A protein has these predicted regions:
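Solvent-exposed interaction patches of small proteins and small membrane subunits
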Residues: 1-83
Length: 83
């Protein structure tokens, strides 16, 4: 699997927009509840980006020779270093 860089880029632009909106909400004195809702939405969106990148990295590791040879310990060790 290859990372869809355009899709990830678009998602990151949306996250940047959310963060900008949060900054504006704080500057305008919006309620903490509304600000926290938006912060959680931005965190969730960024987490989805991280999942795409992680999935791509794991797929890459499993596609290498050590993944094909069944040496799961090597793949797990390398994957763990990415976290």
């Amino acid at each position: 699997m290859e990372l869809d860089r355009d899709s990830v880029h678009i998602r990151l632009l949306k996250v940047a927009g959310q963060v900008s909106a949060i900054d504006r909400m704080i500057a305008e004195g919006d309620s903490a509840e509304r600000i926290l809702v938006q912060i959680n939405a931005a965190k969730s969106a960024l987490h989805k980006v991280a999942l795409f990148v992680t999935e791509d990295a794991l797929s890459d590791l499993l596609g290498r020779d050590e993944g094909k040879s069944g040496d799961a310990a090597v793949v797990i060790e390398r994957f763990s270093s990415l976290l």
